[in-house]
Each structure stands twice: as C-alpha cells, then as structure tokens.
Amino acid sequence: MRIGLIEFLLILAIASLTVGPQVALFVDRWVRRANRANARAARRRAEYAAQAAAERDALLKRFRTASTVFGVIILLALAYALVFRPIDTPPQPYRAPDIRQDTGAVQTMLSDDSRDALALGDYQGVDCIRARDGLVYASAYNGATLKKRKSDLVRTDGGHTAAILSVDGELTGFAFDGSGELWLTVVTPAGGTLCRAASDSWGTAVEQVVTQIDGAPLGAVSAVETGPDGVVYFSVASGAATENGLEQTLRTELMAHTGTGCVYAYDLAARAVRKVLGGIAGASGLALSPDGKTLYVSDLGSRCVWAVPADARELTAGGKNCTAFLTGLPGYPGALAADEEGTLYISYRWARSSWLEKNAGSTLLRGIALRAGQNLQEKLFSLPTESPCAEAVTLQDGSWTRAFFARKAGSVTAVCPVESKVYFGTADVQRLPSANV
C-alpha cells in the first residue's frame, strides 16, 4: 500500500501530538540538567579561582613578611657588624694635628730613567733600604698574605742582584752594627721578632733575640737602628695584631689612634731590653743622629717626628724630654734615614686624609671603617702625585731643604741616601728609583 503525502503528513501530525510533549519535556529536562551542571562547574571554577587567589595572596603576604623580617635581620646584622661588633683595636678620640705651611724647599722629581734606578727583581713590596761598602741592600717580600709571605734581603750594585738571606714572614727592617753584624725585624702571624744574622762558612743563620716584652709577644716590629755603642733600637708599630702584615697594622693604627706604639733598646752586652718611648700612634720609622746621641721616631698618626735622647728610658710621646722635632707634616711619615752630613730624610706612606682628621674627635665613622674590612680601608688612603713622597730636613736647625715628588702615585715605604743620590722603595718594586741631591 502506498502512502501519499497527505497520509504521511497526518501520521507526522499524530506522532508529534502523541510523542512531541514527551520529547519536549525530555529536552527541557536535559537542558536544565546541563545548565545546572554548567552552573555547578562555574561555581567550582569560581571557588577554585577564589581559593587560588586567596592562597596566592596569603603566599605573597607570607613572602612580604619573610622579606621584611629578613631585611630587618640583615640590617641588624649589618649594624652589628659595622657599629657594635667588638674589635681588637677600638678607635680612640684624638686631636687632629696642625697643617704645616709651605716650607719653600727645593722640589725634586724622582728620575724616570731606568739607568738611575737599581733593578731589584720580581717582588711585591719593599720595606727597608740600606747602603754599606758601596752596595745597596733592600728587604723585599712576595706573598699576598702574611701566612704565605717570604722575604729576601737583596744586595745589588746596579748590575748584579743577589738574595743573600731569606726568612719566612715580612722582613720589615734591617741594620748593620759597628762590627758588621746584621740585625733584622721580622713580622709573622705569631708576632714580631728582633733577630740577628750570623754568617760563617756554612752560610747565614738567623737567630731570634727578642720575641716578647714582659711576657707578651712583640707586635708588628717596623724598624731597627744600631747605635755606635752597640745598642740596638727597634720600634713596634702598635699593639694591634700582626696577622695582616706591617702595612695593614699601620693603617689600622692610623684609623684607631690607640697610641700603643713603642720604641725599645736592646743592650747586647747586658742582654736586656729597655723601653725608650711609648704612646706613639704608629711607630713607623727610626733614625739616629750622626753622633748617636739623638733618636728620631716617626709618628704616623700624629704626622710628626719625635726626637728623644738615645739613652732615654720610659718616655712618653709628647711628654717630658720628648721633643716634637717636625710637626704638621703633609703626609703620614714612614721610614726615616739620616746621612753623615746631618740631613734627615722622611718618607711618606700616604698623604694626609682630610676625612680621617675631620673625624678625629669622633669614633663612629672610624669604627665603621675599621670593621668594614681591608679592601675598603685601602681605598681611604693614597699618595697622589701632587703630594710629596719624601722630604729632607737639616738636623742642626730643622730647616727644610728638599721635597721629593714621584710621577706615579703610590706610597713610599723606604728611603736611603747614598752619596749624591737618594733611593726609594715605592709601589714599583721591580726597581728602586732614585733622585739626585
């Protein structure tokens, strides 16, 4: 039987009237169910997003709190390290020395000609220069830290160089006595030592003579001088520890100004030590007058040179029988040397620091600098080319004769007059530059 169009349409109409409401109801239920599922999913997503945002905010809050606490701890630790941390040499207030006026002395430049210099060798520092029998001797060292430092006593005549003696540590000074014996001051991490070098057919042996005073180890011994009567004078820069070498000890005393530097005399015949002078803010150099009756001592922190009788006992810098021979120096004096004609040569390690002396009466900033470490301290002091690296003065009347200048900046650690020349220990330790006088 064939179904026509009309019959087909009637069947569809009857089916739609019979089944349609149920289909519509099913679709409506399905749509509502889907909408409810979507709503629940949306709520869950919103809840998840809100929870994630809350967790993120809580985490950020905890992070900010932790960062604040950490920052406060760092600031407190920094404040403790720079301001409150105990140090071995707490700074002391002092009165800044006066500034000397221009002396009008002849200005002399150190020679740039290599022919005027004495070749030394590959070393990192020079602490002392002496001349004897036409030869020049220099104490030079290698080693960035004192624990690794080795020092040689180098002899040169301008053409040939030889290390005649070697010691562990820093050989800060040496001097020949009237009998030709060699006296040395050596600094090691354990402390300072006054030594004597004896030579025989087997070689040269170094004997420790003085290692402590009144049961306490010697500090950083900085210089040695021998008198015509056989007495050996030696200086201790300060009471600070010697673990970083002489230069750092002097720099520490310069900032702390503890006034614990001393000069001692060792009597070889009596095998006894007496204190000559105390209260020095960095005893950095010694020299004897040609007649051996007057001892000159450079005071680093006070920018002066003291003059005391060579046979003095228990004097105090600036006190009775201690004369301020030179004051208001333009730099911080180091090594001294006196020639037979009565001229005293003063070398300068650093130029006067206006920052340091501006804070002389206060200990806060100097204490911070002392706690800040060696790298920062090294940047506080320098010897620029416009400042004299050394000067010469007549011992008889204290008149200034020469001011020496170098074309390269750098501290001068040693000075030695030899006939018509003066040799210097400078930052260029490959050679010893000179100046004609």
Where are the regions a protein language model picked out?
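Terminal non-domain segments
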Residues: 51, 74-75
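N-terminal intrinsically disordered, acidic low-complexity segments at the extreme N-terminus
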Residues: 33-51
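Membrane-spanning helices that line or support transport/gating and their immediate boundary helices
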Residues: 22-34
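Short, Lys/Arg-rich cytosolic juxtamembrane segment immediately N-terminal
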Residues: 54-66
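Exposed, low-complexity/repetitive linear segments and helix-based recognition motifs
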Residues: 4, 44, 52-54, 336
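Hydrophobic single transmembrane helices highlighted by the model
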Residues: 1-25
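Sequence-structural signature of mature extracellular/luminal beta-sheet repeat domains
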Residues: 71, 77-437
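Hydrophobic H-region at the start of alpha-helical membrane spans
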Residues: 4-8, 64-74
